[in-house]
Every structure is written in structure tokens, then in C-alpha cells.
Design a protein with these regions (language model features):
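Alpha-helical scaffold domains
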Residues: 1-222
């Protein structure tokens, strides 16, 4: 039995239709859910990984992509958990292809934000020389989710944040009417404001951000 088959069987065995409906409602009914709480889902995943340790270690990229193409949202979250666990210190230059595919498949804030911060953020720490090329591509893409990713990928960078790049992304997208873009700008600025509040305040006060972006950017500074 393959890893994916094991996960399917265990998720189906733990399905809770009523809770799944609530989870689906929370994400605007974009995805069906088995109705498995996060803690239980991760317990199931942990047990399955122990049973299929060698298969997953060898083929985790293909497994993640297979899971991400299934309809249930728990499958997508399992794929992300596996990818982030297995990819540590194993990034390859071509992994950007898979990361972009995951960002563009079954996209919503809950998957995109995790992939942006940890998958792309980790990849660009491993290959910093690719940063400008990839962020320019994502920033100019027709996909709002890739645009959001270009803005928030530095969320975990703290003092290592390239503030010039962040400002550039904010300037490029500050007139967007997309809720998720306005929130992304505010979130990214707020996170950097935790280590450099003076720079963030100066930027916010000297540029014409949308009200939501400005509110989100300064709400922990002022």
C-alpha cells in the first residue's frame, strides 16, 4: 500500500461531515473537507510517515504534488506539512517549479501564506541569488496569489529583511483593490516593524497606502 493510499484511508475513516461543513464554510466553500481537526490530521500524518518513511523521503516532491491535486483541503495541508518537513537542507535549484505549482493550485490564503513564508522564503534563503528574478516574476504575474507571495515571502526574515525590496513591492501594489493584496502589504510592513518600527512608520507616513494596508502596518507600532 502506498503512502497516499494510507492517508486517504485514514482520513476517510476519521471523516466528520458536520465539522467538515463548518471548515468549508470558513474558507468560503472553496474546498471540501473531511472534517478532521488539525491536531488529529497531524497525528494521522505522523503515523503514516512512520509506515512509509523511505517512500516519502525518496519521493516527497511527487507525493506532495499528488496530494495537492486531490479535492479535500486536508490533503493540501498534509502536502505542505510533508514538503516543509522533508525539504529542510534539501532545497534544489529546480524546486521553484514545484513551489510555484503548489502556490497556483487550489489557491487560498491558508495554503499560499504558509508556502510563501516557509517554502519560498526557505528556498530564497538557500538560493538568495534567485530572489530578484523570482520576486519580479511573481510580482508581475496575473495571479493575485503570486503577487501576495512576492509581498509576504520575507515574513520570517526579521533583521534579514530586504526593506528596499519590500518597499518596492508595496509601491507596485499599493493601489490594488484586492483585499488580499492590501492585507499582505500591511502584514509584511507590520512584521518588519517589529524589528525596525522607525523605518516602517516613516515609510507609511510618506506614501499613499490604502487605509487597510496602513491600519494593518501600524497597529502594533502605535
Amino acid at each position: 500500500m502506498s503512502f497516499v493510499t494510507t492517508i486517504k484511508q485514514q482520513f476517510e475513516a476519521n471523516e466528520n461531515v458536520a465539522y467538515g461543513k463548518k471548515q468549508s464554510d470558513y474558507l468560503k466553500n472553496n474546498f471540501p473537507f473531511y472534517g478532521i481537526p488539525t491536531t488529529k490530521r497531524r497525528e494521522i500524518l505522523k503515523d503514516a510517515l512512520l509506515l512509509h518513511k523511505e517512500e516519502v523521503s525518496t519521493n516527497f516532491r511527487a507525493i506532495c504534488w499528488e496530494l495537492f491535486q486531490l479535492p479535500q483541503r486536508e490533503m493540501h495541508h498534509a502536502a505542505i506539512d510533508i514538503f516543509l518537513k522533508e525539504i529542510k537542507n534539501k532545497y534544489q535549484i529546480e524546486d521553484i517549479v514545484l513551489i510555484e505549482k503548489l502556490l497556483l493550485t487550489n489557491s487560498w490564503w491558508d495554503s499560499v501564506d504558509t508556502l510563501a513564508k516557509y517554502a519560498l522564503g526557505g528556498y530564497l534563503k538557500a538560493f538568495p541569488e534567485k530572489t530578484l528574478e523570482i520576486i519580479e516574476k511573481f510580482s508581475n504575474a496575473d495571479s493575485m496569489w503570486l503577487n501576495r507571495t512576492a509581498i509576504i515571502f520575507q515574513l520570517g526574515y526579521k533583521e534579514r529583511t530586504d526593506f528596499e525590496l519590500l518597499r518596492s513591492e508595496c509601491e507596485k501594489h499599493k493601489h490594488s483593490t484586492e483585499f488580499f493584496i492590501q492585507k499582505a502589504i500591511g502584514w509584511a510592513l507590520r512584521e518588519y516593524g517589529s524589528v525596525n518600527p522607525t523605518a516602517v512608520l516613516h515609510y507609511v507616513n510618506s506614501t499613499n497606502l490604502k487605509p487597510l494596508s496602513k491600519k494593518e502596518a501600524i497597529r502594533k507600532i502605535i
